[in-house]
Amino acid sequence: MIYAQILAGGKGTRMGNVSMPKQFLPLNGKPIIVHTVEKFILNTRFDKILISSPKEWMNHAEDNIKKYISDDRIVVIEGGEDRNETIMNGIRYVEKTFGLNDEDIIVTHDAVRPFLTHRIIEENIDAAIETGAVDTVIEALDTIVESSNHEFITDIPVRDQMYQGQTPQSFNMKKVYNHYQNLSAEKKQILTDACKICLLAGDQVKLVKGEIFNIKITTPYDLKVANAIIQERIAND
């Protein structure tokens, strides 16, 4: 089976003084998360669409989805303490509710990236079926510098080998779950990217080309950019 998981577990601290997590903030009259989920319900290959929310915001998430979307594939579940635990909670839910087989895949995506495309989703599904681990990326436009002490440059990687990670990130569910369980508690705590779980296990991670406009709405500036993107699309329709 093919599952989607919308990662809506963040609290949005970088958005400033707002009354709710950033995924529920309005974007052109609808919550950001609704725009994102709408992209996934258009794809008929998904058997279920999981929305992972902070426990205290689950009812709010359900109310927002029901207000704008009618699709019985959608289910709201509780997120985890961090990004990777949220993904693992999704896999545990699937295992408990539907059972897992060796071919099941999951396409995980930030709730606050509402501009992903059908192509990106399709290529993630196909690559996950083929390889078991996928990351969506764009080429790095700026030179990347590395600083181990946060004061002086320690390295400048070759730019044409550098990419900026986006989402979706997609996985064979059994593989990524088993790899995660084999990590030490210390490694689990410092890992911030799910694809690194697979890399540490020696798996190859396939790259899927993202889009510059597949932005993550994290700050007030990002929200202004997102509104501008939508207004431009409305004007061009």
Swiss-Prot record:
Enzyme Commission number, as recorded: 2.7.7.40
Site (Positions ribitol 5-phosphate for the nucleophilic attack): 159, 216
SUPFAM superfamilies: Nucleotide-diphospho-sugar transferases
Functional pathway: Cell wall biogenesis; poly(ribitol phosphate) teichoic acid biosynthesis
Tree of life domain: Bacteria
GO biological process: cell wall organization; isoprenoid biosynthetic process; poly(ribitol phosphate) teichoic acid biosynthetic process
Family that this chain belongs to: Belongs to the IspD/TarI cytidylyltransferase family. TarI subfamily.
Name of the protein in question: Ribitol-5-phosphate cytidylyltransferase
Organism: Listeria innocua serovar 6a (strain ATCC BAA-680 / CLIP 11262)
